[in-house]
Structure formats: structure tokens, C-alpha cells
Amino acid sequence: MNVYQNAEHDGSTMASITNTGMLVIAGTEWSRSEVGSNPNVVGWDTYDECDMLGLGCNGSTYEQNLQQMKNKVAQIRGFNDGRFAFANYSKGILGTYWAPGLMDDFMSAVDAASVDNYMYTRADLQDELNRTPAWPEGANTATSAAYGWQIDQMRKFQSTPGIHPNWIFVESARPFLNASNDRTITPEQMEGAMWSGIIHEARGISIFQHNNNGQAGFGTYSLVQAPADRKAKIKAALAGIQSLAPVLNTQSYVWDAGAAGTDTMLKAKDGSAYLFAGIGLNGGTGSKTFTLPAGITGTQVEVVGENRTISVQNGKFTDSFANEYTHHIYKITI
């Protein structure tokens, strides 16, 4: 982890955060004098969930919320300090009751945005998504693929998909939910959700670290106070993503790998192709066969981080996906 998004303003100095090496997106509680010229403060946060009434913005209509957002961004740009304007959105990306007809304006108002719909843990989201025209009929919200879908939705509301970076929020326990059928996410589900977001072109992963599941060993801050074994799994998942940053920061290629029920992303770096794969919405587990682009000469696929290889036969290879959150990264010589 390298960015503190909307760092809490609790009386600590900004330097006490950035001296650890962390970058910061400063919230509106921080004054310009407190932030100063600190080079590790890279952005200004605007508002949280302005695409829903009665939350981050105080307008009585969505139009008023949008204007409030635009005013805040104008103020930030007036600072002329080189820092980007950031916002977090939520249900507006569903394209139903929230911010009707305005979500493209909310997206274009800022330089980068995240979205938070906690699909694994919030049970009532299934009903909300079933009413969403873009949601595939019969798809289960409590899946990794639901996080990649949210990135797709953000991109749909951009004049050019991906013109500004899109981030996905992933919960790290049970994020202040109180319904009897709400759930606590597992580390394996967290990892799958993060990779689903990346496969769908997320440019950042935000982790919500607040918790109220009441389980022994869990604290309110569900990253720093998590049980040691859980924390180790989350740390390993994040390290795996960071290790592939040089690949992830390259341009993706348009390619259909032909494996039914999967989501894939193709990239290339230093003479190797990388195919990232996970289970898609309504996709099943089990055996999947992938087709490689013409011109790839490698006869062995390295499954990154899993200490195994797969033979390529006639430009194809087959692998297994045990769970809905299973994901694999394939490296092949070009």
C-alpha cells in the first residue's frame, strides 16, 4: 500500500504520514498551510458519494450536488499546485435511481475517481443490481467479477473510457453493515476482487479498512487490527500486485482469448506477453482453454506466482479455476 486516501485529520501533522513513505490524497479537513509543498501529497479529495443525496454533498437535488462538486474542483484547480482532484462515487454508476442523467457529468468533473459498492458483504445489493439494466440477468453480486463490472460502469460514463483513472474500493472485513445477512469478506475474495478490478482496467485499488463484524481478533480498523494470518494473506496479495506494476502500467491490447465465462486482459513487457484471467459474471469454475494471439512463439506458459508451467498446443493452453475468485496470470515468450 502506498497511498492514504482522504487521510484522517486527527491533529497529527501531514509530515507524520508522509515521512513513512506514504503518498496522500488530502481531504477537505486539511488546510493548504498544513499541506504546504509536501511532495508526497499528490491530490486533493473532494466529496464522498456526491452521486447520492444526503451524503457527501448537501444539495437537495442532484444538480445542486453536481454544482457543489464543480465548485470544489474549481477551488482545487485554483490552488495551481499540480495536485489532482479526486472523488469517490457509489450507486450513481448503476444507472438507475441515483444521479439520473448526470453521472457522466460527475465523472468528468474530477481528474480521477473511485467507486464503493461492497458486493461481497452487503446483501441488499443483490436486489439493487437486479433492477439495474446493465447487470447480467441471474448474476450473483457476491463475486469477484462484480468489482470488475463496477469499473466497466465507470468507464461507460466517461466521454472516452478510461480518459481519467478509475479506482475500485474493496472492503477488508464487514464495512459497517448491520443486516443479519451481511457478510465478512475473506482474504481470498479480497484478492479476487482486486484482480477483477485490474483486469477491467482499474488504475488503483482502494481498501476500506473499517469493520464492525464483532469477531474475536478483529478491530474497528480491519487492516491494522486484523488477525495476523489474515493480515499476512492480504499483504501477500498486495505484494503480488505491486510486483507486476511494470507490466500493469503498460497499455493493454484488445484480445478475446476465447475462454467462455472468463474475463481477460492482455499486456506485453520485455519480450513476454501477459494474459490476466479471472471468472466473469455468470461464468462457471472448472477447466478453461485460452487462445493466444498469432505470433507468440513460446511453447510453455509460466503461471506467475504459482511455480508451475502449462504446455501450449496449437496456440492454445488449458487451465483450471477452482473458485469464483480464482485468478491466474500467464506469462508467455513472444
Identify the residue ranges that each predicted region occupies.
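Glycan-processing catalytic domains of CAZymes
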Residues: 1-334
